[in-house]
Amino acid sequence: MSYGSITFGDVAIDFSHQEWEYLSLVQKTLYQEVMMENYDNLVSLAGHSVSKPDLITLLEQGKEPWMIVREETRGECTDLDSRCEIISDGKMQLYRKHSCVTLHQRIHNGQKPYECKQCQKSFSHLTELMVHQTIHTSEEPDQCEKFRKAFSHLTDLRKHQKINAREKPYECEECGKVFSYPANLAQHGKVHVEKPYECKECGEAFRTSRQLTVHHRFHYGEKPYECKECGKAFSVYGRLSRHQSIHTGEKPFECNKCGKSFRLKAGLKVHQSIHTGEKPHECKECGKAFRQFSHLVGHKRIHTGEKPYECKECGKGFTCRYQLTMHQRIYSGEKHYECKENGEAFSSGHQLTAPHTFESVEKPYKCEECGKAFSVHGRLTRHQGIHSGKKPYECNKCGKSFRLNSSLKIHQNIHTGEKPYKCKECGKAFSQRAHLAHHNRIHTGYKPFECKECGKSFRCASYLVIHERIHTGEKPYVCQECGKGFSYSHKLTIHRRVHTGEKPYECKECGKAFSVSGQLTQHLSIHSGKKPFECNKCGKSFRFISVLKAHQNIHSAEKPYECKECGKAFRHATSLIYHDRTHAGEKSYECKECGETFSHASHLIIHERIHTSDKPYECKRCGKAFHCASYLVRHESVHADGNPYMCEECGKAFNSSHELSIHHRVHTGEKPFKCNKCRRSFRLRSILEVHQRIHI
């Protein structure tokens, strides 16, 4: 076929009004460019005068091409199994001309009848062959004189010149965006106003019928576009195209500031705003700004409470589709992201990139004040607030201030009592999502953070950091009153209350106040009388699981914690810590009434009851009251029948285990109470106290 016999109708593509609506604004603009180029190519190659088609006239005037009314017979594509972007909802694709049907069907049958005689490469369309053949000509590359840019094809040069020469006189009054054609401006205007296409499933509205069609696929689970490499399917062709670059590894878009490369141009544009600091999309409610418009849209739903994306499994709603997709992987078990180091798979890219061990993390962001380094710049920024002391976020309920807005929001849940994050396993609720995530590891047993010193594993990184201080002996949090050091800040906060006398946790039943929330929790069980934790050996019940565990060691007789000074062994690590203070002579807890000092806060609390005459532990048999619970337990054995605690050495029986322990010293010769004046030792504290009067 000679080029002279080609007409514009052979290389033009026609759209009906319905077809035109399926196209996005980008696709419409591309169509206009291609048609104008095809016409220019035809004029250039034909070598004689070609009459200007109506389609070109309309495009030059900025009118929409579907307005042309043709008389030709209509044809239709019957390949309903195709993955053609335009075909949707099971409808046939209609064409006005049989020639257009023939060209379209080559997409499905793979037919490429036009072959290059130079290199034997085949093409579906004659115009593609014509453009390709210019590669083999000996012509010098075409160059734009204005920009000194060279092109291998004349069509590429013409396209470049049109882009740079074209005026854009049509400006949007809403956002100021400019367009070359009024039709493009009219189409763009719908962004700000019309959304005539509404989804009957969820009520979400769209500007075009095509957007609605694509949206329907999410409800029906339709994913017609499948990757031939890995089999993953997508509901939109564009997502398949983006996905395929994962397999090729191609990242053609490079940042000219830092050299980082991206698979998509959109990804590069978003990245570049990091360097410029530009955040053009601002929320009118709270003033927060975003780099991407989609992030602003998602953020606005926080104010409106809208959660349009609902999980069909559990009914949970989400503000954006990505959150729903991540959530649904809980049920499907999908884990698309695999670590090349150890083969471990993850359900999200964030989990994959999150550090598994502290060794693997690069920390390029260093604080100039203290030298601490961070893997993420945002963490450095937050850390620097510690040095500046600024706390700009104040709670309007209690006046407490915070460095971070997120910390304020979490704090406010204390006043509202809101705990929106609930565990599906046990029903326990949390005020923070992170706390729920950590809690979930109790059920799964997942402990990814391992200590290199002793091999002990932990559910979260912060627990490991605190644990490592046992090996290093580091106590970075120091009390300014007494100089005592602590391994983490929470212990220092509680310790300070010893000096200030602050007791913020009050019992609503009796008005008693406590310095630690855990003490209040323990105290409340006195009023309820509940003892839900029962020993399976002897049937004894306890209010707390920790006390039950301590009790069970009696049956096992195991004492794994040994004192390095004297060799004495203990069932609990805390007991060993308290015992160590005996050797060190450390008594940091002082009574404000009489000045007596104690090695443990609990001993001070019990001692203070002497001054207040507080005896909260009452015997239900005789009504006698005691300062501490252990005295009550010992007393209750008086009412019990028999003496259940028998000495294995001599057979003597006692009412309580405490009395038996004291008796054992007769056989062992143990005298733990030493006089600091003359170094004489005694079996009982009371005998030591009598002895010390000699030295007064």
Curated annotation (Swiss-Prot):
This is Zinc finger protein 607. It is found in: Nucleus. The lineage of its organism: Eukaryota, Metazoa, Chordata, Craniata, Vertebrata. SMART domains: KRAB, ZnF_C2H2. Keywords: DNA-binding, Metal-binding, Nucleus, Repeat, Transcription, Transcription regulation, Zinc, Zinc-finger. Belongs to the krueppel C2H2-type zinc-finger protein family. Its main location: nucleus. Transmembrane segments: none annotated. The keyword NADP does not apply. May be involved in transcriptional regulation. A zinc finger (C2H2-type) spans 114-136, 142-164, 170-192, 197-219, 225-247, 253-275, 281-303, 309-331, 365-387, 393-415, 421-443, 449-471, 477-499, 505-527, 533-555, 561-583, 589-611, 617-639, 645-667, 673-695. GO terms for cellular component: nucleus. Residues 6-78 form the KRAB domain. One of its GO terms (molecular function) is DNA-binding transcription factor activity, RNA polymerase II-specific. It comes from Homo sapiens. SUPFAM superfamilies: beta-beta-alpha zinc fingers (SSF57667), KRAB domain (Kruppel-associated box) (SSF109640). GO terms for biological process: regulation of transcription by RNA polymerase II.
